[in-house]
Amino acid sequence: MSKAPDTTSKIAFTNNNTSFDEAGVNFIVNPYDEWYALVRALELKEAQGGNVTVLSVGGADYEQIIRKALAIGADDAVRIDAPESDALSVSTHIANYAKDKGFDLILCGKETINYNGSVVPGMVAELLDMPLVALAAKLDVANGVATCEREVTGGMEVLEVNLPAVISAAKGMAEQRIPNMRGIMAARTKALEVISVENAAASTSVSNYEMPPAKSACKFVDPANAAELITLLHQEAKVI
């Protein structure tokens, strides 16, 4: 599970636009991890039994992210104390932890809403030599087989994969759950496993951040005023 800035937060950069300024930024659990991957894992546990372990790669500031997952219903939580900005490093840490745990299913959000990389699930699957189903909007598990549905151009694709497998969750796999007070109170005192790793530095670095250009103003033209529309398209938009 990963964190992401709340979409209402003001984004700024420091150190000559090489660092993201986290001052005053409210972080949330990445929705694809929380609403879809985590909740569907809990639904499967409730229907079939089992245990749900949440895993995050990041610093101590990830504790609130992990504890929310516990409040929603996860059984165990692990934080790997390492930088989370490099996708390959994150994937390697996840795979190194999971390789001898005997997990039947690894569920990831399809992407984070701040980076939109969509690469960690595939890297984890490759490192663990497991099959991958990406962008699954529906997931059912029975008799050691996961049945997934995902959107394709013009319809839905149905895939079956033998477990263990890695599946990245897209919108539609589950619905958001709000943690209740009992879950919140229990999560506050539940032990977290923190794993320190050697050579945890990211293998890439950010050379520069840039804000997207400001959007141009939108002009509305009365449908009856074709002459004005032609003038605007010619003189301002310069498309005719």
Give residue ranges: language-model regions.
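N-terminal glycine-rich FAD/FM-binding segment characteristic of electron-transfer flavoproteins
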Residues: 1-240
